[in-house]
From Swiss-Prot:
<dbReference type="GO" id="GO:0000162">
    <property type="term" value="P:L-tryptophan biosynthetic process"/>
</dbReference>
<keyword id="KW-0028">Amino-acid biosynthesis</keyword>
<comment type="similarity">
    <text>Belongs to the TrpF family.</text>
</comment>
<comment type="pathway">
    <text>Amino-acid biosynthesis; L-tryptophan biosynthesis; L-tryptophan from chorismate: step 3/5.</text>
</comment>
<protein>
    <recommendedName>
        <fullName>N-(5'-phosphoribosyl)anthranilate isomerase</fullName>
        <ecNumber>5.3.1.24</ecNumber>
    </recommendedName>
</protein>
<keyword id="KW-0413">Isomerase</keyword>
<dbReference type="InterPro" id="IPR044643">
    <property type="entry name" value="TrpF_fam"/>
</dbReference>
<dbReference type="GO" id="GO:0004640">
    <property type="term" value="F:phosphoribosylanthranilate isomerase activity"/>
</dbReference>
<dbReference type="InterPro" id="IPR011060">
    <property type="entry name" value="RibuloseP-bd_barrel"/>
</dbReference>
<dbReference type="InterPro" id="IPR013785">
    <property type="entry name" value="Aldolase_TIM"/>
</dbReference>
<dbReference type="Pfam" id="PF00697">
    <property type="entry name" value="PRAI"/>
</dbReference>
<keyword id="KW-0822">Tryptophan biosynthesis</keyword>
<dbReference type="InterPro" id="IPR001240">
    <property type="entry name" value="PRAI_dom"/>
</dbReference>
<keyword id="KW-0057">Aromatic amino acid biosynthesis</keyword>
Amino acid sequence: MKIKVCGITRLEDAAMVTELGASIVGVVLDELSPRHASHNTIREIAEAGITVAGVYTSEQTVLSSPLFEDYVQLHFDHDPELIRSIHELGRKVISVINFNGIRDLKIKYNAYREADIILVEYKKGVSSIVSQIAPLGLNVGYAGGISDRDIENIIAAKPSIIDVSSSLESSPGIKHPGKVMSFFKKIRDAMDYVS
Protein backbone atom coordinates (compact mmCIF):
# COMPACT_ATOMS: atom_id res chain seq x y z
CA MET A 1 0.00 0.00 0.00
CA LYS A 2 1.25 3.45 -0.93
CA ILE A 3 0.78 6.53 1.21
CA LYS A 4 0.31 9.96 -0.33
CA VAL A 5 0.64 13.02 1.86
CA CYS A 6 -1.12 15.95 0.24
CA GLY A 7 -1.16 19.68 0.89
CA ILE A 8 2.62 19.96 0.83
CA THR A 9 3.84 23.56 0.47
CA ARG A 10 7.51 23.23 1.46
CA LEU A 11 10.43 21.05 0.42
CA GLU A 12 11.32 20.35 4.07
CA ASP A 13 7.88 18.85 4.69
CA ALA A 14 8.10 16.79 1.50
CA ALA A 15 11.48 15.42 2.62
CA MET A 16 10.23 14.68 6.15
CA VAL A 17 7.11 12.74 5.11
CA THR A 18 9.05 10.83 2.46
CA GLU A 19 11.72 9.85 4.96
CA LEU A 20 9.00 8.56 7.30
CA GLY A 21 7.30 6.47 4.60
CA ALA A 22 5.25 8.53 2.14
CA SER A 23 5.39 7.18 -1.41
CA ILE A 24 4.01 10.33 -3.04
CA VAL A 25 3.63 13.93 -1.91
CA GLY A 26 0.86 16.11 -3.29
CA VAL A 27 1.11 19.80 -4.14
CA VAL A 28 -2.20 21.64 -4.57
CA LEU A 29 -2.19 24.14 -7.44
CA ASP A 30 -5.63 25.65 -6.79
CA GLU A 31 -5.09 29.30 -5.79
CA LEU A 32 -8.26 29.24 -3.68
CA SER A 33 -6.89 26.52 -1.40
CA PRO A 34 -5.15 27.47 1.87
CA ARG A 35 -2.65 24.73 0.91
CA HIS A 36 -1.86 26.27 -2.47
CA ALA A 37 1.70 26.06 -3.74
CA SER A 38 3.37 26.75 -7.08
CA HIS A 39 4.86 24.88 -10.00
CA ASN A 40 8.24 25.98 -8.65
CA THR A 41 7.50 24.06 -5.44
CA ILE A 42 6.75 20.98 -7.53
CA ARG A 43 9.96 21.41 -9.51
CA GLU A 44 12.02 21.85 -6.33
CA ILE A 45 10.52 18.68 -4.80
CA ALA A 46 10.98 16.68 -8.02
CA GLU A 47 14.60 17.83 -8.34
CA ALA A 48 15.18 16.51 -4.80
CA GLY A 49 14.21 13.05 -6.07
CA ILE A 50 10.85 12.92 -4.29
CA THR A 51 7.84 11.49 -6.13
CA VAL A 52 5.33 14.31 -6.45
CA ALA A 53 1.76 14.75 -7.66
CA GLY A 54 0.42 18.07 -8.88
CA VAL A 55 -3.21 18.44 -7.79
CA TYR A 56 -5.38 20.23 -10.37
CA THR A 57 -8.97 21.42 -10.09
CA SER A 58 -9.63 22.22 -13.77
CA GLU A 59 -8.66 20.89 -17.17
CA GLN A 60 -7.45 24.33 -18.24
CA THR A 61 -4.84 24.43 -15.47
CA VAL A 62 -3.57 20.98 -16.48
CA LEU A 63 -3.25 21.99 -20.13
CA SER A 64 -1.29 25.14 -19.25
CA SER A 65 1.01 23.41 -16.76
CA PRO A 66 4.73 22.72 -17.32
CA LEU A 67 4.11 19.27 -15.72
CA PHE A 68 7.24 18.93 -13.58
CA GLU A 69 5.48 16.27 -11.51
CA ASP A 70 5.44 12.47 -11.72
CA TYR A 71 1.66 12.23 -11.20
CA VAL A 72 -1.08 14.54 -12.41
CA GLN A 73 -4.00 14.39 -9.99
CA LEU A 74 -7.31 15.33 -11.59
CA HIS A 75 -9.56 16.64 -8.84
CA PHE A 76 -12.50 17.42 -11.15
CA ASP A 77 -14.82 15.52 -13.50
CA HIS A 78 -12.91 14.58 -16.65
CA ASP A 79 -13.04 12.22 -19.58
CA PRO A 80 -10.78 9.32 -20.55
CA GLU A 81 -9.24 11.40 -23.34
CA LEU A 82 -7.57 13.71 -20.81
CA ILE A 83 -6.11 10.68 -19.02
CA ARG A 84 -4.71 9.38 -22.32
CA SER A 85 -3.29 12.82 -23.22
CA ILE A 86 -1.43 13.02 -19.91
CA HIS A 87 -0.09 9.48 -20.38
CA GLU A 88 1.19 10.51 -23.83
CA LEU A 89 3.21 13.25 -22.09
CA GLY A 90 4.89 10.59 -19.95
CA ARG A 91 3.06 11.33 -16.72
CA LYS A 92 0.96 9.07 -14.49
CA VAL A 93 -2.61 9.98 -13.59
CA ILE A 94 -4.53 9.97 -10.33
CA SER A 95 -8.26 10.41 -11.00
CA VAL A 96 -10.31 11.56 -8.01
CA ILE A 97 -13.92 10.53 -7.51
CA ASN A 98 -15.83 12.51 -4.90
CA PHE A 99 -18.12 9.87 -3.41
CA ASN A 100 -21.75 10.69 -4.09
CA GLY A 101 -23.33 7.24 -3.88
CA ILE A 102 -22.36 3.82 -5.19
CA ARG A 103 -24.08 4.19 -8.59
CA ASP A 104 -22.21 7.42 -9.42
CA LEU A 105 -19.01 5.84 -8.13
CA LYS A 106 -19.29 2.86 -10.49
CA ILE A 107 -20.00 5.10 -13.49
CA LYS A 108 -16.95 7.29 -12.78
CA TYR A 109 -14.78 4.28 -11.94
CA ASN A 110 -15.51 2.83 -15.39
CA ALA A 111 -14.80 6.19 -17.06
CA TYR A 112 -11.49 6.61 -15.19
CA ARG A 113 -10.25 3.01 -15.42
CA GLU A 114 -7.23 4.01 -17.54
CA ALA A 115 -5.87 6.13 -14.67
CA ASP A 116 -2.91 4.72 -12.76
CA ILE A 117 -4.70 5.36 -9.46
CA ILE A 118 -8.38 6.04 -8.79
CA LEU A 119 -8.77 7.90 -5.53
CA VAL A 120 -12.20 7.77 -3.88
CA GLU A 121 -12.66 10.79 -1.65
CA TYR A 122 -15.37 11.20 0.96
CA LYS A 123 -15.05 14.38 2.99
CA LYS A 124 -17.25 13.04 5.82
CA GLY A 125 -14.74 10.26 6.40
CA VAL A 126 -13.91 7.55 3.89
CA SER A 127 -13.63 4.91 6.63
CA SER A 128 -17.44 4.95 6.89
CA ILE A 129 -17.83 3.74 3.28
CA VAL A 130 -14.89 1.36 2.77
CA SER A 131 -17.15 -1.69 2.73
CA GLN A 132 -18.98 -0.22 -0.28
CA ILE A 133 -15.88 0.73 -2.25
CA ALA A 134 -13.44 -2.07 -1.37
CA PRO A 135 -14.54 -4.42 -4.18
CA LEU A 136 -13.93 -1.92 -7.00
CA GLY A 137 -10.40 -2.77 -8.13
CA LEU A 138 -6.70 -3.02 -7.44
CA ASN A 139 -5.83 0.57 -8.35
CA VAL A 140 -8.34 2.16 -5.95
CA GLY A 141 -7.25 4.35 -3.07
CA TYR A 142 -9.01 6.29 -0.33
CA ALA A 143 -9.01 9.91 0.80
CA GLY A 144 -11.04 12.05 3.14
CA GLY A 145 -10.96 12.30 6.88
CA ILE A 146 -8.26 9.66 7.34
CA SER A 147 -6.43 9.91 10.64
CA ASP A 148 -4.60 7.60 13.02
CA ARG A 149 -7.95 6.86 14.74
CA ASP A 150 -9.39 4.91 11.80
CA ILE A 151 -6.29 3.59 10.07
CA GLU A 152 -6.88 -0.09 11.02
CA ASN A 153 -10.30 -0.04 9.35
CA ILE A 154 -8.85 1.60 6.25
CA ILE A 155 -5.89 -0.80 5.93
CA ALA A 156 -8.11 -3.86 6.45
CA ALA A 157 -9.94 -2.87 3.23
CA LYS A 158 -6.61 -3.17 1.33
CA PRO A 159 -6.56 0.03 -0.72
CA SER A 160 -3.70 0.52 -3.18
CA ILE A 161 -3.05 3.95 -1.66
CA ILE A 162 -4.32 6.24 1.08
CA ASP A 163 -4.19 10.02 0.86
CA VAL A 164 -3.89 12.17 3.99
CA SER A 165 -3.50 15.89 4.44
CA SER A 166 -5.06 18.05 7.14
CA SER A 167 -4.84 15.44 9.92
CA LEU A 168 -1.03 15.81 9.78
CA GLU A 169 -0.89 19.61 9.95
CA SER A 170 -0.02 22.21 12.52
CA SER A 171 -1.62 24.80 10.19
CA PRO A 172 -2.84 24.66 6.57
CA GLY A 173 0.04 23.52 4.37
CA ILE A 174 2.50 23.01 7.25
CA LYS A 175 3.04 19.43 8.42
CA HIS A 176 3.50 18.76 12.14
CA PRO A 177 6.46 16.38 12.70
CA GLY A 178 4.88 14.76 15.78
CA LYS A 179 1.58 14.09 14.00
CA VAL A 180 3.39 12.72 10.95
CA MET A 181 5.57 10.38 13.05
CA SER A 182 2.58 9.17 15.06
CA PHE A 183 0.55 8.53 11.90
CA PHE A 184 3.25 6.47 10.22
CA LYS A 185 3.81 4.47 13.41
CA LYS A 186 0.07 3.70 13.53
CA ILE A 187 0.21 2.58 9.90
CA ARG A 188 3.12 0.21 10.59
CA ASP A 189 1.35 -1.17 13.66
CA ALA A 190 -1.94 -1.59 11.77
CA MET A 191 -0.24 -3.32 8.85
CA ASP A 192 1.43 -5.75 11.26
CA TYR A 193 -1.96 -6.37 12.89
CA VAL A 194 -3.86 -6.84 9.61
CA SER A 195 -1.26 -9.11 7.98
